[in-house]
């Protein structure tokens, strides 16, 4: 959701696309930003992280999208490349769209209906962690296995601009999922490979014109935004700044210093715990703002191999971990909880199956008497996560294991722990931020059997329970009524009784900008975080 500047963008590119329809004094200029790590991907089919979605929200527009707004308003699904929300058949199985006229990619090619069909197929070809959202399309499950013949449940007419999607059964969350970046159309001929180093042409107000994985990337105005797409999609903002240059700066304290001094205009990640209070006290309301999130921080356990294939061991770790100790590590930026669903999510119901009890944890490990006591603890190299991983390693030692900490560059962390071929995937840190405001998003990607892949898996615990998977699928078909919310609360408890995770908190993030930026104008979208189109200079 990084070497002072990345390669300069040619002025001609900027001038060709300038203009969001305004001439306010704050328009124009170059926004200089820092991220603590390079996103998982800068490819819309693959990106599935808060950093990645912040980076691509204003470049790749799906058929539907989320309103560019703060809070609850930002969770509203609105038309993107489609003229309107779809016509949905009475049985909930058929969705009909029509593309807007005159749409162009940033390379000048016209956007056509078949580009959407290919985008969905590309998600499956690349084994994207987003593919479970679309397996209910007729023919998608078969295509996921064979990667041949196309998905027959999508019919696209390039002349008419009409797109028809047929589902195998109703899916109550399908509109929200279509508004995610995964299936944003891309031009015909886009390679079926990770394009993070050379991101594909854009349909949004900005295009990524340079990318150096691990170091940074830069944007210019899409030259076809003002010419075509802004007229076709007047509901979407065009952005104020002309260019954006992002640099990866791994030392969060240095980022704070740089933003204070005006060397950078914005740091995407929050201030580090040891600087958080200082920044909050000094700049809240003028340069700093705390942002609530729907998120869960947790430790996953690999349920497919010893010792965590034993329920007693998994429960022992839950008893041994003290969420309040982790809250202190994060200096209050994570508030302790022990549920899968975060407090603001429909279906949340507070419970505490595993109150901190080290003695009980030791007894469970003693009863299980696992033969394998050599544990690898995985985490990334961002400071709070590394400290959380160190804490977990010490807890495991306290209950009778030999634990080794494996710290991974945050750029590659989820690619490594999501890859089945990675050795010693025992237990590790992770966090999950909502994809869309529905409790299904906290269950299907992480606890359904269909979300286990050889690569890019989001089910990090490799948790496979047919009964739970069936319940997740059943609830996904239904409208989100109070009765269904109560069923999600029951599902939360049911999964945690099997203890594939150790949930320990829900997080807040922060927006920290230089004195040159108008903080009041910065939009914090609940799915995509800071909206690049909303940054403007005073």
Please name every model-derived segment.
Residues 220, 227, 308-399, 462, ...:
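Append "and occasionally in soluble cytosolic enzymes with long acidic Gly/Pro-rich linkers
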Residues 68-72, 148, 170-243, 359:
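Gly/Pro-rich hinge or "lid" segments in bacterial periplasmic/extracellular proteins
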Residues 19, 86, 154-156, 315, ...:
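Extracytoplasmic/peripheral linker and loop segments enriched in polar/acidic and small residues
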Residues 34-90, 201:
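N-terminal lobe/hinge region of extracytoplasmic solute-binding protein
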């Amino acid at each position: 959701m990084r070497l002072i500047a990345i390669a300069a963008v040619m002025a001609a590119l900027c001038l060709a696309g300038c203009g969001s329809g305004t001439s306010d004094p704050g328009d124009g200029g170059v926004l200089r930003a820092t991220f603590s790590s390079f996103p998982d991907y800068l490819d819309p089919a693959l990106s599935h992280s808060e950093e990645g979605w912040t980076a691509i929200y204003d470049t790749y527009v799906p058929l539907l999208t989320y309103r560019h707004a703060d809070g609850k308003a930002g969770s509203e699904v609105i038309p993107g490349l489609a003229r309107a929300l779809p016509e949905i058949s009475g049985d909930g199985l058929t969705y009909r769209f029509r593309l807007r006229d005159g749409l162009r990619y940033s390379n000048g090619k016209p956007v056509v209906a078949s580009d959407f069909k290919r985008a969905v197929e590309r998600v499956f070809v690349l084994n994207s962690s987003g593919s479970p959202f679309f397996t209910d399309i007729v023919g998608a499950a078969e295509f996921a296995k064979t990667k041949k013949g196309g998905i027959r449940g999508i019919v696209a007419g390039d002349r008419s601009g009409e797109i028809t999607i047929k589902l195998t059964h109703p899916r109550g969350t399908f509109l929200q999922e279509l508004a995610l970046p995964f299936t944003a159309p891309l031009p015909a001929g886009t390679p079926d490979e990770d394009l993070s180093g050379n991101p594909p042409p854009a349909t949004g107000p900005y295009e990524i014109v340079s990318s150096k994985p691990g170091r940074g990337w830069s944007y210019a105005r899409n030259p076809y935004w003002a010419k075509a797409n802004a007229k076709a999609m007047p509901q979407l903002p065009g952005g104020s700044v002309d260019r954006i240059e992002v640099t990866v700066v791994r030392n969060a304290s240095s980022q704070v210093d740089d933003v204070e001094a005006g060397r950078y205009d914005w740091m995407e990640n929050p201030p580090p715990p040891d600087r958080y209070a200082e920044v909050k006290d000094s700049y809240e309301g003028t340069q700093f703002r705390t942002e609530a999130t729907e998120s869960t921080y947790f430790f996953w356990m690999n349920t497919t191999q010893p010792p965590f294939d034993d329920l007693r061991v998994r429960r022992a770790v839950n008893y041994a971990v003290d969420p309040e100790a982790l809250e202190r590590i994060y200096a209050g930026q994570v508030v302790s909880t022990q549920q899968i669903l975060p407090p603001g999510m429909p279906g949340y119901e507070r419970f505490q199956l595993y109150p901190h009890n080290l003695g009980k944890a030791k007894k469970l490990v003693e009863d299980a008497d696992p033969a394998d006591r050599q544990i690898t603890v995985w985490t990334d190299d961002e400071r709070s996560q590394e400290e959380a991983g160190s804490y977990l390693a010490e807890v495991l030692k306290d209950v009778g294991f030999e634990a080794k900490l494996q710290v991974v560059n945050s750029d590659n962390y989820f690619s490594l722990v999501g890859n089945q071929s990675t050795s010693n995937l025992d237990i590790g840190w992770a966090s999950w931020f909502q994809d869309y405001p529905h409790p299904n998003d906290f269950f299907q990607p992480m606890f359904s059997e269909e979300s286990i892949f050889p690569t890019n898996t989001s089910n990090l615990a490799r948790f496979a329970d047919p009964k739970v998977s069936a319940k997740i699928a059943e609830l996904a078909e239904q409208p989100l009524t109070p009765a269904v919310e109560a069923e999600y609360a029951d599902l939360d408890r049911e999964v945690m009784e099997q203890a594939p995770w150790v949930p320990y908190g829900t997080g807040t993030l922060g927006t920290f900008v230089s004195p040159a930026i108008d903080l009041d104008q910065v939009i914090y979208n609940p799915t995509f975080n800071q909206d690049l189109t909303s940054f403007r200079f005073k």
